[in-house]
Amino acid sequence: MEKRILGLDPGLAILGFGAITCTPGLTQLQSTKVNILDFGVIKTSADIEIGQRLCTLFDDLHTVIDNLQPDVVAIEKLFFYRMSSTIVVAQARGVVMLALAQHHLPYVEFTPAQVKLALTGYGNADKSEVQEAVARELDLAEIPQPDDAADALAVALTAWYQM
């Protein structure tokens, strides 16, 4: 049975999303087919008041969810050294959680280290190694752009590996 997984890389300026479809083999020995359903970003302008930016994220994420109809959502967990960055991304994550709750969607969360480990086998891999692994796993000639969308696909793949 096909599963749709929506990966999200939350941010206020740019929220990356990447959706995959996964069709398991009939037995554990058979390979699993994983395909890209869609990927992209939701952007908000720094020129707009933060409340309006959060509304834009919320509305646009609803549209993405309605269009892609995921079975489960995978979200990258917060990990920042600067408090100001953490607060802004936490606000965006709150909007994400509200949208998921309104759609009654289950979600899983992964730290950046968990995503790196799942895709490269090494929890301290750099961003380019993870993005190359995404392209390889999804049989793409090029790394998906922008980076936030590639990161969201990495989170979706991590969820699939954990199922």
Swiss-Prot record:
List of residues binding Mg(2+) 2: E76
Compartment(s): Cytoplasm
One example GO MF annotation: magnesium ion binding
Record GO cellular component, one term: Holliday junction resolvase complex
EC number from the UniProt entry: 3.1.21.10
GO process terms (BP): DNA recombination; DNA repair
Residues involved in Mg(2+) 1 binding: D9, D148
Coiled coil: none
Keywords: Cytoplasm, DNA damage, DNA recombination, DNA repair, DNA-binding, Endonuclease, Hydrolase, Magnesium, Metal-binding, Nuclease
Reactions this protein catalyses: Endonucleolytic cleavage at a junction such as a reciprocal single-stranded crossover between two homologous DNA duplexes (Holliday junction)
Details of cofactor binding: Binds 2 Mg(2+) ion per subunit.
Positions annotated as active site in the UniProt record: D9, E76, D148
Transmembrane segments: none
Cofactor or coenzyme needed: Mg(2+)
Similarity comment: family membership: Belongs to the RuvC family.
Subunit composition and interactions: Homodimer which binds Holliday junction (HJ) DNA. The HJ becomes 2-fold symmetrical on binding to RuvC with unstacked arms; it has a different conformation from HJ DNA in complex with RuvA. In the full resolvosome a probable DNA-RuvA(4)-RuvB(12)-RuvC(2) complex forms which resolves the HJ.
NCBIfam families cross-referenced by the UniProt entry: PRK00039.2-1 (NF000711), ruvC (TIGR00228)
Functional note: The RuvA-RuvB-RuvC complex processes Holliday junction (HJ) DNA during genetic recombination and DNA repair. Endonuclease that resolves HJ intermediates. Cleaves cruciform DNA by making single-stranded nicks across the HJ at symmetrical positions within the homologous arms, yielding a 5'-phosphate and a 3'-hydroxyl group; requires a central core of homology in the junction. The consensus cleavage sequence is 5'-(A/T)TT(C/G)-3'. Cleavage occurs on the 3'-side of the TT dinucleotide at the point of strand exchange.
Protein name (Swiss-Prot/TrEMBL): Crossover junction endodeoxyribonuclease RuvC
